[in-house]
Every structure is written in C-alpha cells, then in structure tokens.
C-alpha cells in the first residue's frame, strides 16, 4: 500500500487546495464514462479494498473517464473518493463524508449512484458492487453494523432492486454496466432484480478471489478506449479478469461471464415453462432430473447448478421421452446462450456456461433455506420455487454420483 494513497499526497497548503478543487471542477464536464465502485471493505476484506483502490490510482481519472469510489473500512469511516493518477481525493464534504455508514443499507447504495450520476456526469455509467457475495442470498455485509448493533445485515435482492430503482427515478439513467466483484452472483435470481435498470452484468458463478477485479487493467483499458459502449466495456472487464487469474499459479476455479439484460425476459419465461414441465412429470422422471442435475457443474454452494449445463443434460437424456420437457429445456438453452455474451472459465470449471441457478439436490438443502428462497422474486414469480420444493420433498429417488 502506498502511504496515504486513499486520501491523497501530503503537500503544502497551496498545492493541496489546487488538487482538492481540481477534481470536482474537472468532473463537472460530461465525460465518456463514470465508473462507480461501491467498495464495502468494512469486514475482513479491508486489505483488498485498499489494494484495489491503489490499483485504480495507477491509472486514475482523466479528461474522458471518472473513477469514483465509496470506500468503507473497518479502520475508519466511509469516504467518497475521486480517484486520480497517484492519489485519491475526498470529494464528499457536501454529503457529510467522511462518516460511518452501513454499506448494507440500500439507501446508501442508492445515494452513491445518484451522486455519481449527478456530480460526475457522463455518456455511460458503470457501477461495481464490491464485497462478499452470496448469490441470491445477498451482497455487501457490514461488520461495523454487526459489532455495534448485533445485526448480520446485507443488501438483499429486494433491496438491491430498490436501490437501483430509486436511483433511476432520481436520475433517469439506466446503468450501462453493473459489475459484481463478489462471489457467486451469476444467477438469474440476481439478474432478474436489475431488469429495467441495467444493460449488461459482469459476474461469476464461482467464488471470486480476494484480489477481486484487476482494477489497474480494466481502468487502463477504459482510459485507452473511452468511447467503448456498455457491451464492450463489460467484455473488457471479463477478459481482463480471466487473463489476470490465468497468470496466477493455483487459480484453477475461476469463472466470469457477461449477461445481456435484453434477454432477461425471454430467459425468465423459459425457466418458468421448464419448471412447469418438470413439475408435471416429477413422479415419472425424478431420477432422471437427479442424474442430470448432478452431471452439471456446481460451485462453492453445491446447490448452485450451471443452468445451461442442466438444461442440455435434460435435452440429451435418453431416459426422458417427454417432448414437452425437452422443448422447454431447449428454450432455456437458447435464451441463456443469447444472454451470456462471454463466459471464461479455468480448468476446474471448464463446463461452466455463465449462469447458475438454485437447485438443491437434498431435502435438507432445500428446507434449510426455504424461507429465504421464498423471498426471491424470480423464484416465486416463476414456477421454479414450486419445482425445487416438490423435487426436494419427493421420496424414492435413486442417488446418483457424477461421472466423468
């Protein structure tokens, strides 16, 4: 870590005043991109938060790109930072920063997005959510809130949508790229919550290493080509991430994918139809479903199953002769493959295709999280929750083991 890199270099009063006021003044002009990083380091990831901010400072904002970070750590209060080449300056005085905030509060996220759009205007916007992730179970845990109030809080899927919806109502801006620098977030249960408010998502089916996104690489690439659109920048993030971890020995279970939200509705309808078909023939084909689920890639949470892999297994399963099931499964494959623009995987996850879905294989696996999953809009607004519940409750299954 560079000394004082979070808050800028120590200088004489005159120089400091010049630096402090240069950032917000130059940021007023509309640029090509504003990248907002919601960096929740108020937990055991604090060291990585500082590291990633230092990486951004290796490039910094310029005439075409703004990098804005809301950074919270265990060691001190949160601060709103404008990242420049070699330093970051506090620019949140008008909003009371630095101050202690609960990064698990969706209102804090909403305000941050609104500040980024209003105070750092651009043609295109990216928001990166940085912290621990639990897939549909949530993102952004705040340990200071836990220590002070005993509340193990996070931003839930419902709250995440509320934050982006609220920011949209204030700014009328759809976010071009939402990146999840957090584990296990590449799920339709997650992407469904950002329909209408985001164009492209970058996320991982598997866990994300503590080092997270390579911020120096993605920042350098964006500054070098600031006119890229949302799809291109999302692909840049994914490619840089893949290349970065391919260069590090031992990183063998890394995944990253880009999802085009244009296809979210089509995918939702397809999964709904598949759940209905699977449920209707559950008593006939339960063991086939079990086998096809186990043969698909799974992740740190073993109840997260690769969606396209499972659907393709159904299509190719000779023990299933129900045309309705196969047709519905094929439509899931088509919709998901349209939506997943790129998917990079390391050797452990070579069969991963970019989206996982919650599909527990055991009764306990379903019922330990049943009440939580019932709160997930994608699950209950489609047939998927009903299918998972019925499947987990069904007696007489033959337990298969993954082959190959």
Residue ranges, per PLM feature:
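N-terminal extension/subdomain marker
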Residues: 28-122
């Amino acid at each position: 870590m560079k000394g004082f890199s979070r808050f800028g270099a120590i200088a004489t009063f005159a120089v400091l005043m010049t630096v402090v006021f240069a950032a917000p003044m130059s940021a007023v002009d509309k640029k090509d991109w504003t990248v907002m990083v919601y960096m929740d380091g108020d937990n055991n990831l604090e060291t990585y938060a500082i590291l990633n901010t230092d990486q951004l400072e290796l490039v910094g904002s310029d005439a075409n790109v703004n990098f804005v970070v809301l950074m919270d750590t265990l060691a001190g209060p949160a601060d709103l930072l404008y990242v420049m080449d070699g330093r970051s300056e506090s620019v949140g005085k008008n909003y009371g920063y630095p101050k202690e905030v609960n990064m698990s509060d969706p209102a804090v996220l909403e305000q941050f997005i609104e500040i980024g759009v209003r105070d750092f205007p651009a043609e295109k916007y990216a928001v990166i959510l940085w912290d621990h992730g639990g897939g549909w179970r949530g993102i952004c845990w705040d340990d200071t809130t836990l220590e002070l109030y005993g509340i193990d809080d996070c931003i839930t899927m419902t709250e995440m949508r509320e934050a982006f919806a609220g920011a949209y109502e204030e700014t009328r801006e759809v976010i071009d790229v939402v990146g999840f620098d957090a584990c296990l977030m590449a799920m339709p249960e997650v992407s469904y919550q950002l329909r209408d408010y985001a164009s492209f998502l970058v996320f991982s089916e598997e866990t994300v290493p503590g080092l997270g996104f390579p911020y120096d690489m993605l920042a350098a690439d964006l500054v070098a080509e600031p006119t890229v659109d949302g799809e291109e920048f999302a692909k840049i993030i994914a490619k840089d991430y893949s290349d970065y971890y391919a260069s590090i020995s031992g990183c063998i279970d890394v995944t990253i994918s880009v999802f085009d939200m244009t296809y979210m509705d089509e995918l939702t309808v397809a999964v709904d139809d598949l759940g209905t078909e699977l449920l209707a023939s559950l008593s006939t084909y339960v063991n086939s479903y079990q086998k096809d689920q186990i043969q698909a890639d799974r992740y740190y949470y073993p109840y997260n199953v690769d969606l396209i892999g499972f659907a393709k297994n159904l299509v190719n399963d000779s023990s299933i002769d129900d045309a309705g099931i196969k047709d519905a499964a094929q439509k899931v494959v088509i919709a998901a493959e349209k939506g997943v623009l790129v998917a990079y995987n390391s050797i452990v996850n070579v069969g991963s295709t970019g989206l996982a879905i919650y599909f527990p294989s055991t009764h306990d696996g379903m019922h330990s999280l049943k009440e939580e999953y019932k709160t997930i809009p994608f699950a209950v607004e489609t047939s998927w929750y009903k299918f998972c519940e019925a499947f987990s409750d069904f007696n007489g299954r033959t337990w298969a083991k993954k082959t190959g």
